[in-house]
């Protein structure tokens, strides 16, 4: 098991089939600095090994794309892809050059819905939802139902993009408190990418718009420093396509799998 402690509670999590990516990647600890309470994020060995071993990073992302595509083609939209709902088993670490992911599972289908029943769409975790669901875009929902093969990946591939971006930035996107992060030996203070009090949809949407206008800037201080220039540029290009604000232009899972980032 692993646990998370905040000002009021201690949360224990027990998981079978692996540990969630969030549990492996971050440990969050509240502390006082100059009289102010901030949260310090400690990176897990898994996260460091993942970005230090490009072949395993590609394997993880490609496997998740294929898994989502498989689910979607069955007419099911997961609609709650996030770090807590991806379980990982692995062995070794980058220091010994034997890091390997052995199992990947997408869990928690409590928010999933059939593409022919769009009335079942929920927004349990709005920070990871795509803009068209965040804003309640009725045109998209109608097109999804009537022409589902074209737009069937739109919801889940956005959520996957945000999940991977969260790992890059080393900070849960929902954090709305001041957070201290250390990347490549440098200390940064920030908040989560979509963190806002009340988790209001319109505020999250505005942050989504800001993100899409400046992904390169957001990734300036990130774990991507561990990638070589070729992989870094190709990955950012793929991520931009996954996080395209216009759902009609957003990349499909199959096209993402065929992106140059995955070519050896």
Walk through the language-model features, giving the residues of each.
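Terminal C-lobe "cap" of eukaryotic-type protein kinase domains
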Residues: 244-249, 253-264
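Activation segment/activation loop of eukaryotic-type protein kinase catalytic domains
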Residues: 89-131, 136
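Conserved C-terminal C-lobe helix
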Residues: 230-243
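Short beta-strand micro-motifs within the conserved protein kinase catalytic domain, predominantly
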Residues: 1-10
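Activation segment signature within eukaryotic-like protein kinase domains
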Residues: 60-61
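Catalytic-loop of the protein kinase fold
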Residues: 72-89
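Structural motif in protein kinase domains
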Residues: 17-45
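Conserved C-lobe activation region of Hanks-type protein kinase-like domains
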Residues: 134-158, 162-224
């Amino acid at each position: 098991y692993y646990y998370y402690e905040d000002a009021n509670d201690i949360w224990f999590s027990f998981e079978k089939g692996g540990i969630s990516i969030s549990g492996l990647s971050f440990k969050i600890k509240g502390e006082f600095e100059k009289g102010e309470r901030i949260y310090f994020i400690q990176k897990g060995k898994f996260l460091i090994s993942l970005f230090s071993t490009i072949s395993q990073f590609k394997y993880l992302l490609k496997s998740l794309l294929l898994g989502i595509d498989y689910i979607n083609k069955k007419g099911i939209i997961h609609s709650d892809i996030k770090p807590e709902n991806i379980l990982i088993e692995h062995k070794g670490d980058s220091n010994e050059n034997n890091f390997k992911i052995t199992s990947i599972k997408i869990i928690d289908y409590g928010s999933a819905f059939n593409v022919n029943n769009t009335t079942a769409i929920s927004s349990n975790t709005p920070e990871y939802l795509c803009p068209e669901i965040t804003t309640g875009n009725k045109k998209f929902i109608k097109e999804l139902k009537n022409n589902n093969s074209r737009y069937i990946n739109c919801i889940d591939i956005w959520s996957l993009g945000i999940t991977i971006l969260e790992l890059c930035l080393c900070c849960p996107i929902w954090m709305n408190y001041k957070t201290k992060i250390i990347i490549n030996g440098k200390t940064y203070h920030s908040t989560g990418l979509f963190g806002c009090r009340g988790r209001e949809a319109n505020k999250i949407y505005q942050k989504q718009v800001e993100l899409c206008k400046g992904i390169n800037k957001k990734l300036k201080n990130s774990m991507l420093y561990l990638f070589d220039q070729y992989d870094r540029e190709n990955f950012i290009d793929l991520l931009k396509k996954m996080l395209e604000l216009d759902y009609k232009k957003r990349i499909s899972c199959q096209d993402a799998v065929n992106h140059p980032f995955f070519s050896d």
